[in-house]
Amino acid sequence: MSHPTTFNSHLWQQHRLAQQPIEISILLTQMGFAAKVLAREISRAALMGNLGLMGETNATGDAQKKLDVFSNQIVIDAFSNIGLVAVIASEELDQVKLIECGQQAQYILCTDPLDGSSNTDTGSAVGTIFGIYRRQTSGYCSTEADVLQPGTELVTAGYVLYGTSTMLVYTTGGRVDGFTLDPSLGEFLLSHENIRCPETGKTYSANLSYYQEWHPHIQNFADYLSDRKSHTAHTLRYSGALVADVHRCLLEGGLYFYPPTADQPEGKLRLLYECAPLAFLVEQAGGKATSGLARIMDLEVTSIHQRSPLVIGSQVAVNLYQTFLEQGKAA
């Protein structure tokens, strides 16, 4: 019987065999540690009185849950005092948070610490999204300018899914690997090696409650997917947690889309710490991610809480979405 590969031993192998910088391995190890703490705290939140609202909103206007604030602090603590992270940009912070100054602090962490936090009160799936960049400026201390980088500059990205099991999925480019937490060992074990996103699929994820606010050509696309009398019919699977829905697309194919609306013409999801990290990961697995008009990875970032539409998943499904958009523009 072969021994399972732990996340830390996998990272060491990547450093030794694939010349992955040791700093990246250290940063990913810290994310793994934060994920273990979050998995524990999320699972017992109801017992510890950590459910419900804080009574405040975050930088992007979302109502903050107690677990949002708690999760944000866990991630910050995990990356503080290791000497590698210069600043952190988070959904839960109005501005970037300065962590370390000096020549060793060459990395930028962008994160949504608790994606889908509206699910916490019902015990449904939630997640953590992260993306890491290198500093671009040469000053002693980093600035917000170091954070405003396109997805093409990511050095590593991934997510953690807290559901029926806790799973960490990440990429440093070239491949995507997934690890499942064994609670009895307290270790993430390699469970999904070299994940490849299917070219197509029969499920889609979208918040259809906004259907009336979508442009007509996007409505036509949704109608096409849901036509039960046609061979084009897809099954709707929408959880309210971006990580959970993208994870399904990654493993089973299909697509997730969150288009612009009249009230939110720039989209709802945040480019820097939601769209770009997931786009990088899905592309490395053979999938595709677009705003509907442009590749997510190429979009210019002008503010830390900048929003973007997102269409992500299988190549065929995302291309079909874009076909409907082109037909709408040509009409």
From Swiss-Prot:
Binding locations of Mg(2+) 2: D112, D115, E274
Pfam families, per the entry: FBPase (PF00316), FBPase_C (PF18913)
EC category: hydrolase
Subcellular location: Cytoplasm
Cofactor note: Binds 2 magnesium ions per subunit.
EC number: 3.1.3.11
Protein's pathway: Carbohydrate biosynthesis; Calvin cycle
Keywords of this entry: Calvin cycle, Carbohydrate metabolism, Cytoplasm, Hydrolase, Magnesium, Metal-binding
GO molecular-function terms, A-Z: fructose 1,6-bisphosphate 1-phosphatase activity; magnesium ion binding
Protein residues bound to substrate: D115, G116, S117, S118, N207, Y238, K268
Binding site for Mg(2+) 1: E91, D112, L114
UniProt catalytic activity: beta-D-fructose 1,6-bisphosphate + H2O = beta-D-fructose 6-phosphate + phosphate
Cystine pairs: none
Cofactor(s) of this protein: Mg(2+)
GO CC aspect terms: cytosol
GO biological process per UniProt: fructose 1,6-bisphosphate metabolic process; fructose 6-phosphate metabolic process; fructose metabolic process; gluconeogenesis; reductive pentose-phosphate cycle; sucrose biosynthetic process
PANTHER family per UniProt: FRUCTOSE-1,6-BISPHOSPHATASE-RELATED (PTHR11556), SEDOHEPTULOSE-1,7-BISPHOSPHATASE, CHLOROPLASTIC (PTHR11556:SF35)
Subunit structure of this chain's protein: Homotetramer.
NCBIfam families tied to this protein: PRK09293.1-1
Family: Belongs to the FBPase class 1 family.
Protein name: Fructose-1,6-bisphosphatase class 1 2
Species in which this protein is naturally found: Acaryochloris marina (strain MBIC 11017)
Protein encoded by which gene: fbp2
